[in-house]
Amino acid sequence: MTLFDRVFSGNDAVFGLTEGAIDGAIAQYGEDKAVSFPNTAYSLPCYYAVTGTKVTTLKELKEALGVVKTLMTREKRLNDAFMSGVATALCAEFIEVLKYIDGATPYEEPCYGHLADAVIRELGVPLVTGDIPGVAVILGSAPTVEEGVALVKSYQAQGILVTLVGGIIDQVAEAGMKTGANVRVIPLGKDVTAVIHVVSVALRAALIFGNVTPGDAGTLMKYTMDRVPAFVNAFKPLDDVIVACGAGAIALGFPVITNETENIFRVPKSLIVQEDVSKFNATSLEARDIKIKITNIDIPVAFASAFEGEIIRRKDMQVEFDGSRVDCAELVQTCDASEVEDHKITVVGPEVDDMELGSKNSIAYVVKVAGKNMQPDFEPVIERKFHNYINCIEGVYHTGQRDMQRIRISIDAFNAGFKIKHIGEVLYASVKNEFDAVVDKCEVVIYTDPAECTRVRHEVAIPIFDKRDERLDTLTDESVDVYYSCILCQAFSPSHVCVVTPERLGLCGAVSWLDAKATHQLDPNGPCQVITKERPIDENLGSYEDVDEAVQKFSQGALEHVTPVSYTHLTLPTILRV
């Protein structure tokens, strides 16, 4: 069977069940019997959101089923499969609403079933602010209780809202795990049709927060794809009904990750096979492009900007790593996503415990990063931040960069349990947090074995540094169309601005034209802004009207005219700094 056959088969099965259930309800209650979910102003929320029509009676529900039938085309195209998935979801909503006839309460603790509008509004704010970075829908039974609980807890620890459908509910109960809206783990129901209650959350969010007009299906699906960061984890075995439900999720922009390998068909970025359940979390976040802010770094000492100015004297030092005396290096490397294992920290060589008190040692750390928007030009920008990151560790001192850095670890930090691996934890968390726009995955390898440090420095790092320098050497002021401003120092010098050109660094000596360009790409509203050079006053002196205007703007009017070439030739008493 093809994927189309499985979706259509599952859709037909659910449609038949729905039709029978509605006919049975009409026979029992009559077609004028009211139907509704409790505590919602949106009638049947999913059907109303998709079609713009409210359903209030069994007669209208029967008519709505006819509308759903029109979505069930059988052309073997992805769009038809997805629409059949939507039809399956709407049928699931019809089956679920029948459970609530006469004000029945079909769900008992721990299951929630339908979620009231008030819950949607309560969840809406943290979803918008990013306090809830995503919504996980876990469907079926995990291979083991331990694996299922570990997956749920991994999402819970990241602040993700977790909804449970099917056997996973019994598994977390067996493990004694607490569930409920207050801990953001919500069991919906054990029937597969209960999955519609989380779909209802997404669609009502579009109506409530997105101002989407009911019935505007195109805008609705764009909103859920762009604004509702949900995804599905479906454990094997997957029957045709679950496959059809998965097609509906994909139509809304929610990727499905499964460990099923039998008779399953991959759809890039939408239907993803991940056989290792322990990797469901990382695969799901990557597929949905969810970035998790790391608020707690697992190290035994404090981490804060208050420690940036901390000096560690030799008498207070446990060990030192000194690039001026032994081989050291710090490097960022851009890799393919398949080459990076997120949050893997590896130490190759001795730990601090194995080093003599007060000794000088080698260290080289390579931070491997991967991301759809990552570029090699960003590497030195990230590297330059290592100084700040490591200096924020209580009891650790860092200075220098590239292959001339020096690090000291204090006796107090060592006694508190600080290890080399904790430098990796800090680098990982800081890079993922600050460069989340371009870094999706990050892995840190720290070498303390002297032979490995020598190899990394001379065979890996220095050739990369040389290539960067050679590239910059080929650029001239005349060969580029734009310069960049740099106002990083305005925190303590409010009218200070540098005009960074290929031939002229910022006066600090740390910001090259390529660095400024990368900084602007990473943070378009940040300290480095594009300065055009389209209206020349005197090209020999490098004088341009638009450069003058930019300098006047960024210096708060303290400087009105600048000629970059005069910085070298001193033909005018102006420089690039005020």
Regions of interest found by a model, annotated:
Residues 2-386:
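Acidic, serine/proline-rich low-complexity intrinsically disordered regions
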Residues 424-476:
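A broadly conserved sequence feature marking short terminus-proximal activation segments
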Residues 475-483:
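Short, flexible, mixed-charge glycine/proline-rich loop motifs
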Residues 482-485, 494, 504:
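Short metal-coordination and nucleic-acid-contact micro-motifs, chiefly zinc-binding Cys/His arrays
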Residues 504-510:
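Cysteine-rich micro-motifs
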Residues 568-574:
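Conserved small/polar residues in nucleotide/adenosyl-binding loops
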